[in-house]
C-alpha cells in the first residue's frame, strides 16, 4: 500500500504502518501465551507466560523497515505502461532509488528505461520483499554491478533498487501535478445514457493527462464505456490496477484512462456512456501533469 500512499503524498500529513512493539498485554493464558499478530518483536520461546520469556526476536515485519529504511530524496518523475506495476523514484545526491511493486496475481515483465544514467552507475543495491498467502515472506538484498534490461517481478513482490552513482545528478526539468474534481458524483449508470462532466480552469502544456473513473458494477456488465473528451473519443484500457475482484459480490475500483495532453483545454467536457445499465459512477477526476520543457 505504501506506493499508493506515495502517489498521494501531497494529501497526507503522515502514514504509519499498523505495527506495534511486543504487545505484552496479549501474552495471557486466554491467548495461549501467543504474541499479537501485528508485533515487531515476539518471544524467542513462544507459548511461555510473560514472566518466563527468555528474550525477544524480530518478527517478519522487520523486513518492511529493512526494505525502505534508506529511501529518501526528491521525487523523480516516473511512468509505467503496465497499470499493475507501481513505480516510485527518488534522487538523493549520488543515490537514485527506484521502487517497483507488482499488483497482479502473476509475474510481470519489467523493462526499465534508465539510459540517462549512462556510465555514471557505480553499482546497484537490490532489495526484494515478497509476501505469500500461505508461507513466510521472502526477503533478500544484494549489490550487483548491473541488472538486466528486462526482468520479471513476482506476484506480491516489491523491489527497491538503489543506483549508486559516481557523480551527483541534477534535475533539469520540473513536473507539476494537478487533480481536477468533477462536481457530479455517485451517478446511476443507465444503458446508452450520456453522463456529462465539466472540468474548468485547467492548466495544460507539455506532459500527460488521464481520467480516474471510479465505478461500482456487477461483474457481468461492462467496465469499458464510450468516453469522449471535448468531442474526441479516447480508448478505455482492458487492464487496470489490481485484480478483477471476482471473489467479491461486485466490482468497485478506479480505472485510469490515458488522455492525450493535446486534447486538454482550459475548459473541458467529458462524456461517458455505458452499453448496459446497473451500478454507479462514483467519481471522475482529471489528472494533469505538466512541465516547462517536454519530458524525455
Q: For the regions a protein language model found, what residue spans apply to each?
A:
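Aromatic/acidic polysaccharide-binding cleft in carbohydrate-active enzymes
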Residues: 1-63
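Extended hydrophobic-aromatic, low-complexity segments
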Residues: 25-26, 77, 99, 107-112
Amino acid at each position: 500500500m505504501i506506493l499508493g500512499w506515495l502517489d498521494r503524498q501531497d494529501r497526507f500529513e503522515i502514514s504509519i504502518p499498523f505495527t506495534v512493539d511486543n504487545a505484552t498485554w496479549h501474552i495471557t493464558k486466554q491467548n495461549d501465551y501467543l504474541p499479537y499478530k501485528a508485533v515487531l518483536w515476539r518471544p524467542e520461546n513462544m507459548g511461555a507466560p510473560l514472566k518466563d520469556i527468555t528474550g525477544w526476536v524480530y518478527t517478519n515485519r522487520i523486513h518492511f523497515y529493512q526494505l525502505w529504511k534508506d529511501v529518501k530524496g526528491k521525487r523523480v518523475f516516473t511512468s509505467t505502461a503496465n497499470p499493475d506495476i507501481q513505480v516510485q523514484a527518488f534522487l538523493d545526491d549520488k543515490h537514485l532509488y527506484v521502487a517497483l511493486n507488482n499488483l497482479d496475481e502473476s509475474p510481470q515483465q519489467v523493462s526499465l528505461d534508465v539510459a540517462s544514467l549512462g556510465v555514471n552507475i557505480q553499482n546497484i543495491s537490490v532489495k526484494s520483499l515478497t509476501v505469500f498467502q500461505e508461507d513466510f515472506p521472502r526477503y533478500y538484498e544484494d549489490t550487483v554491478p548491473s541488472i538486466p534490461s528486462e526482468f520479471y517481478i513476482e506476484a506480491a513482490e516489491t523491489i527497491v533498487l538503489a543506483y549508486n552513482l559516481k557523480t551527483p545528478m541534477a534535475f533539469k526539468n520540473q513536473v507539476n501535478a494537478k487533480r481536477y474534481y468533477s462536481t457530479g458524483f455517485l451517478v446511476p449508470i443507465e444503458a446508452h445514457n450520456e453522463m456529462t462532466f465539466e472540468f474548468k480552469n485547467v492548466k495544460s502544456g507539455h506532459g500527460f493527462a488521464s481520467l480516474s473513473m471510479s465505478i461500482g458494477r456487477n461483474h457481468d456488465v461492462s467496465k469499458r464505456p464510450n468516453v469522449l473528451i471535448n468531442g474526441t473519443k479516447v480508448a478505455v484500457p482492458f487492464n487496470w490496477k489490481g485484480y478483477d475482484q471476482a471473489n467479491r459480490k461486485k466490482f468497485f475500483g478506479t480505472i485510469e484512462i490515458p488522455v492525450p495532453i493535446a486534447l486538454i483545454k482550459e475548459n473541458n467536457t467529458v462524456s461517458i456512456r455505458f452499453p448496459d445499465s446497473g451500478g454507479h459512477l462514483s467519481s471522475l477526476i482529471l489528472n494533469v501533469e505538466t512541465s516547462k520543457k517536454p519530458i524525455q
